[in-house]
Amino acid sequence: MRKRHLRLGQQMWALLCKNWLRKFRMRRETLLEWLFSLLLILFVYQLSSNLHQVHDAPEMSVVDLGRVDNFNDSNYMMVFAPESEATHEIMNKVASAPFMKGRTIVACPDEKSMNELDLNYSIDAVRVIFKDTFSYHLKFSWGQRIPKTKEHKDHSAPCEPLNNKMICENSAFWEKGFVAFQAAINAGIIEMITNHSVMEELMSVIGSNMKMPPFIAQGGVATDFFIFFCVISFSSLIYYLSVNITQERQYMTTLMAMMGLRESAFWLSWSLMYAGFILVVAVLMSLIVKSAQVVVLTGFMVVFLLFLFYGLSLITLSFLMSVLIKKPFLTGLAIFILTVFWGSLGFTALYKHLPAFVEWTLCFLSPFAFTTGMAQLIHLDYDVNSNVNLNSPNNSYLIMATLFMLVLDALLYLVLALYFDKITLSKYGHQRSPLFFLKSSYWFKRRGASHVVLENEIDSDPSLNDSLEPVSPEFQGKEAIRIKNLKKEYSGKHGKVEALRGLGFDIYEGQITALLGHSGAGKTTLINTLSGLSPPTTGSVTIYNQTVSEMDDSDAVLTITGVCPQSNVQFGFLTVRENLRLFAKIKGILPHEVEQEVQQVLQDLEMENIQDILAQNLSGGQKRKLTLGIAILGDPQVLLLDEPTAGLDPLSRHRIWNLLKERRAGRVIVFSTQFMDEADILADRKVFISNGRLKCAGSSLFLKKKWGIGYHLSLHLNEACDPEGITSLVKKHISDARLTTQSEERLVYILPLERTNKFPDLYRDLDRCSNQGIEDYGVSMTTLNEVFLKLEGKSMADESDVGICGRLQSDGARDMESLVELEQVLSLDSSGSSVSGMALWRQQLCAVAKVRFFKLKNERKSLMTVLLLFGISFVPQLLEHLVYKVYHKSYSWGLSPSMYFLSPGQPPQDPLTHLLVINRTGSSIDNFVHALRQQGIALDLDALGTRNGTEEALYNGAITVLGEEKALRFSVACNAKRLNCFPVLMDIISNGLLGIFNSSERIQTDRSTVFEEHMLYEYGFMSNAFFWIPVAASLTPYIAMGSISDHKKKVLSQLWTSGLYPSAYWCGQALVDIPIYFLILFLMQIMDSVFSSEEFISVMESLLIQIPCSIGYASSLIFMTYVISFIFRNGRKNSGIWSFFFLIVTIFFIIATDINEYGFLELLICTFLVPPFTLIGSLLIFSEVSYDSVDYLGTSESQLVFLALLIPYLHFLLFFFILRCLERYLRKKSLRVDPVFRISPRSCPAVPNPEEPGEEDEDVQMERVRTTGAMATLQTDEKPVIIASCLRKEYIGRTKRCFSKMKKKIATRNISFCVKKGEVLGLLGHNGAGKSTTISMITGDTIPTAGQVFLKGSGGGAALGFLGYCPQENVLWPNLTVKEHLELYAAVKGLKKKDAVVTITRLVNALKLQDHLKALVRTLSEGVKRKLCFVLSILGNPPVVLLDEPSTGMDPEGQQQMWQAIRATFTNTERGALLTTHYMAEAEAVCDRVAIMVSGRLRCIGSIQHLKSKFGKDYLLEMKVKTPSQVEPLNTEIMRLFPQAARQERYSSLMVYKLPVEDVRPLSEAFFKLERLKENFDLEEYSLSQSTLEQVFLELSKEQELDDFGEEANSSVKWKLLPQEEL
C-alpha cells in the first residue's frame, strides 16, 4: 500500500488542470462560450458607439419664455366633453382668451362621441374632458404640444443644443399652448365659481427656465439598453459554468467524493478558472463603459471593481442554482432568467427613488445591486460638482456600499450553496439535518471513539446457520468488514423500497468475496453502502473497526479503500493517462509517486497502447478497465468492485482475474457480478443475496454440494450412435440419471452428486462402447448458474432446453407442457400470412408515419423550440399591436404639487424641494401665502424680495409675486430637469387665487395623450410576412431531422435489415412532418390575418394565395431537410445551426431582392434557386408584380402566377429525386425491390480469395469442404440457411505521410462455414478477432473483398426479403412503448394486421413481456430490452437470424429464459442462427456447434464437447477435508496418484489441484482413485470437473497473429503460443 494524504491544494490544482484541459479539448463548447461573450461585447461596443449619446452640457443661463398670452397658433380647434351648462359656461369664458379669437370650440355629449368625431387630421384637436367642475384633463395627439415622455429620467438631458442655443423639453408646455389652454380654462372655472375674472392675472404670467449648472446626461433608451447588456454581459460564461458544474455534480462529484475529494477543492477549481474569465470580460466591459462615456467622472478602477464583483457574485449564484436544480440546461436557463429579471428590477433605481430599506434589501440580488451601482454612477455624473473616488469618503459612500453588497452577495450565495448541498437529498441518499451546523459533532471530531454494537445491529437470523459455510481457522480473527443488521430504504414512486433487509455477515482479509444475486437483489446497494456512497438506514458497516457511516472515520476509510462503481468513472475529454493522474492526486497519492503509480497501473492492466487516447473514444471494455485502474490506484487495502469486468472479452477478463488474485494477500477484495463463472473461478467465498436478504455464503464446493443438481456427463456422438441404447446404459448404473440435452451430435445427462461411487463402473462401460458411436465424453461439476437458479426456486434442468431439443425427462408433467408449448409458439410459421409489393409499401408507410408521430410527440425539446420560435415570429406584430392598444386607450398623467414639492413637516427627500415664493409687491401677500399652504406645500418665503427665482437652481420651482395686493401679477421659474413644472405651478397659482376668494375647492389638471388609428398598419400584409416567414423557414430542422438520430442509434440499419423499403421510410416521415409544418405555416398566416387591419375579403384572398404556396413550400423544405440530414447523417444533429442558417439565408435574400431596386427577374431567379426563400418570393410575385413587368417578360399575368405557384412543387420533386439517388448509391444494399424508388437488391460479384487456406485445423478443413459442397448442390432444400465461403475483408488504413503507401488491414482471412437448418452456430473470438466484420458481411452492411455469402440458397439475400437481427446494442426508440415497436416491425416484415396481433400476443406471452407492453423503452430494465430485441429479430419467422450477444446485461435467471427461448425458436425448424458472444456459458447452453476465430481466421469448429476434449488441457479437482491435520498426508497421496498435479489454493480445509488430461484418463480410473481417497481420508466432499469452454477459449485466444498487415495478401500465417497463464 502507498501512503495517501488527502490534501486540499493538490486536489484543487488537479481539478483546475482538468478544467483547463476541458476547455482546450472541448473546443466547440469553448468557442461558443467565448464567441457569444465576445459578440455581446462587440454589440455593446457598437451600441455605445452608434446609438449612445452623452450630453456634456455647460452652464445654461436663464431662458425667458415670455407671457402666457404670447401663444399664437391658429392651426387647432377645441373639443370638450361632456356637454353641460357648467362646461358650456367655462368654455365660453375660455373663448374670451386673447389666443382663442376666431378658434372653433365644439361640444360633445361624452368622451366616446368625442373619439368618434370625424375630424380633419390636418387640424390639431385640443380635447378637454371634464371629470367635474374643478377637474379636467387636456388631451392631445401623441407627440403634439406636449412632450412624449411623462417625466424626465434622472440621467437624461433636459435641454439639448439647437442652433447655438439650448432648447429645454419642458418649454414645450409653455411655447405650444398647454399652459395657455390650462390658464384659460382655470380662469373660466374661477370666474364661474367666484364671479371674479382672473383672466388677466393668469394670461400675464411670465415663465422662465432657471439658470442651470453644468451637467452630464445620457441618451435615453440607448443608455437603458446599454445597462441591460452590461447586466447580461457574463451570461454566456455563467451559462456554461452552471451547465458544467451541474453535469459534474450529477455524474461525477459524488463518485469522486468517495475517493476522497474535498468539496471545497471542487468549488475552488471552478471558481478560480472562471474568476480569470470574469476578469477578462470585466476589463473589456470597463474599457467600453469608459470609452463610450457611459460613466464619465468615475475612475476606471471603480467601474472595473463593479463589473468584477458582479461577475464573481454570478459565479457563486451558479453554484447555488446547480445545487438546487439538478438538470444542467434548466440550471443555466434559470440563472439567465434570474439575471434578466433581477437586473431589470434594478432599473427602478434608475427611474424611481425607492425607500432606502427596500433598495438595500433588493441589493441582496446581485443583478439588482449591479444595476443600482450603474445607476448611481450615472446619477453622480449628472451633476458635474460630484465625483467618485475610492479615496473620497464624502462622495463614494453609495458606490462603496454597492461594491460591499456585491461582495456580500457572492459570499452569501456561496454559503447558501454549501448549506443546501449538505441538506438536500443526494442521488445516493446523503442528507444532513437542516440544523447540522449547530451540532458540536460537525465542528469537532471525536477522538478514539470505539464502535458500540447496538441492539438493532445484532444479527437475528439463526436459520441461516446451515446455509453459511464455517470459516477456516486461518481466517478467524481476520474479519476486515463487518456488516451488522444492515437495512437500506429508498423512496420510490409507490412508497418506500427496501433494498437491503437486515443483512449481516463478515468479509475476511486475504479472501476474494463475490456478491451474487438476481437483478435488484441489493448487490450494488451493498457496494455503495460499503464504499460510503450511500448511507444505511439502520445497522452498521465497519471496515477495520472504522464505521463507514460516521463522518469522523470517513478519511480513515477513504485512504484505504478503492472503489469501482457500476457506472464508468472517467472524464471523456481526458486521456487514459490523464484520468489516472487526476484520480491519483484526488486520492492523495504523494506528488512524487503519482507518475510511478500511474505507469504501474497502465502496465498491470495492459493499457500502455491506449494511454494517450481520449476516454470518450475508448470501447466499453476499455472504459471499464480504466475505471478499474482508477480503483486500484494507490494499491488500496480494501477493493470494492461492482461488476468490474462487465463488457470485457474473456481474455481481458482473465487477465483482470489474475491481477486480483495477485493482490489478494493481505487485502480485502469484494466484487459483485452476474457472471457466475467469474465468481466460480475468481472468488474464494461467494455470498448469495436475494431481495435484500442473505441467502447463503461459502466456497464453490460447499455451494455446489449443497444446492447443485449433479455432474454433467456430456457425450460427443457420430451418426452410428443409438441414443436409446446409451440412455439405457447410463440408467443401468445410475437409475436416477436424467437426459437433459439431445441433438445429432451430443447427449447430456445429469448424474446426482451422491452417486459418485457408481461413476467408475459407468465410465468403464462407456469406454468399452467407443464402437457404438461415442467419439468422446467428459464430465463437469454442477455450475454456480444451477446453484443460483435452485436458490431462486427454479431448477436449471427444468428451465433449460430440456425436452425442447428432443427427449425430455422431467419430474413434473406441468414443466413438460409449458416447455413444449413454448417451442410451439416460438417455432410458429407466419410466412404464409404476409403481404408484398405496393400493399406492403402502404403498410410500411402507415407504420412509419405512426411511429414518427409518436416520436415527434415525445420530443419535448424540439416541440418547445418550435413553439418558442412560433411565438418569436409574432413578437414584432404583438408589440406593435400592444403599443397601439396602450396608446389608443386614453391615459391621464396627474399634475400635482407633490410631484416636485415637499409637504409641510415632510423630511427631505430627493428630488423634492420647498417651493420658493418671492414677494416683490412691496406689501403683504399673506392671503396668497396662506392659500398656497392650504394646498399642502412646504414654502420657502422670501418676504423682502431679495432673491432671484431664476438663479435658484437648488429649487424645483419658484413663484415671484409682483403688482399690487388687489392686482397681483406672477412670474414663474422652473428647474429644466422637472418636465411638468410649468403646468404644476400654473395650477398652484390658480388654486392660490381661488383661495384668496375664500373657496376651499381645488383645480386639478391632468395631461392626456391619444394615439390615432391612422398611425398604425402602414405597410399591408407583406410587412408582417417579412417577420414570420424567415422564422417559419428555420423551423424545419427541428421537425425533419429525426433521421440523423435514427441513423446514429442504428435504428435505420435495423429497419433496412428487417426489410423496410427506403421510400416507405422517407414518405412515412413526410406523411407526418409535412402536415405538421403546413399547420404551423397556416397558423402563422391566421395570426398574421388576426393582426391585419385589412378587410375580411382581402384577408381571405391573401389566404387563398398563401395556402397552395405553403403546401408546396412545406413539402419542398421538408424534403430538402431530409437530403441535408442524409448527407450529414454521421455528424451531430445540429438542428439549431441549420435553423440559424435557414433564417439567415431567408433574411439575406429578403433584403437582397428588394423588387423596387433589383427588379422582377432577380426576384424570380432567387425564388427558384433558394428554397427557403420560395414562399416569400412567391408571395412577393403575387403582391408586387406590376403589369409593366409582365409585358417586359413577354407572358401573361396568369402564367406568371401559375409559375410562382409551381416553383415549390418543382423543388419538392427535385429533392425527392436527389433523396432517391442518395439511397441508391450511398446506402447499404436493399433486401427488397423498392416499388417507389425503384431500387433493386444489388448482387456482389464473386471474387476469388487470393490467399490459400494454408495450415488449418482438420475440423476447419472439413467445414470448408462441406461449404464448397453446399454451394455446388442444386437441391435447395438440402442447402444450409447461411453459407459463408472464403470470406476476406481488407480495409485501407491511414498513413501519417502524404506520399507513403497505404497500408492494408485484413480483418478476416478465408473464412468458410455454414449454418444448417435448425442449427445455432456460435461464433466466438476476442475483441478484434473479426466477428463483427463477418456479421457485417452477412447482413450486407459490408461488401467482402473476396468470397461470397449465400443466405438460404440465394447469393446476396435477394430472395430473402428480410433478416432477423438482434444487435448487441439495444437499437430501440427510448420514447416508444414495447407494443409500438412490435407493431412497427410486424408491419415492416409484412405481417397482416390481424395475423400480427396473434403473433405478437404469442411471442409476448412466451417471453413474459405482458406487463411491459405499454411501458416506454427508457423505463425498462436491461433484461427486458434484450428480450424485446430478440422478439423483434424473430418476428415474421425469418429463415436467417443473427444474434449478437443476445443475453448481455441480464441476470442468470433472465439469461436462462433467453437461452431457453433461443433453443425453442430454432430446434427442428427451417430456420438457422449465427450467434456471437463473449459469454462462454451462453455458447454452451445455446449452440449446437461453436467456431472460434483468432486473428481473422477460423481456429477451430465443432461441438462443445468435441472442442473440450480436443483442446481442454486440464481437469480441476477440489477436495474439502474435515481436519487440518489431514492436509499434508492427503497432498502426498494426491501427488502419488496424479504425478503431474499442480496445487492451486493453499487453505487449511480446501485443497484445489489442476490435473492434466493424461493423468485423468480414463475417467473410470480417476473416479475409482478418488473414491478410495474419500474413504481412506474421510473427505467431507470432492469434485472433479473437465475444462470449461471458457478455459478452452482462453487457451486458443493466446495464439496471436504475427503477420504484418502491410504485407502482401498471399503471405503465410504464423501462430505463436504465448506463455501460459493460470486458469
From Swiss-Prot:
Keywords: ATP-binding, Glycoprotein, Membrane, Nucleotide-binding, Repeat, Translocase, Transmembrane, Transmembrane helix, Transport. Its EC number is 7.6.2.-. GO terms for cellular component: membrane; mitochondrion. It is a multi-pass membrane protein. ATP 1 binds at G517, H518, S519, G520, A521, G522, K523, T524. InterPro entries: AAA+_ATPase, ABC2_TM, ABC_transporter-like_ATP-bd, ABC_transporter-like_CS, ABCA, P-loop_NTPase, R2_ABCA1-4-like. Induction: Down-regulated by digoxin. It holds the Pfam family ABC_tran. Belongs to the ABC transporter superfamily. ABCA family. PANTHER family: ABC-TYPE ORGANIC ANION TRANSPORTER ABCA8 (PTHR19229:SF274), ATP-BINDING CASSETTE TRANSPORTER SUBFAMILY A ABCA (PTHR19229). This is ATP-binding cassette sub-family A member 9. It comes from Mus musculus. The gene is Abca9.
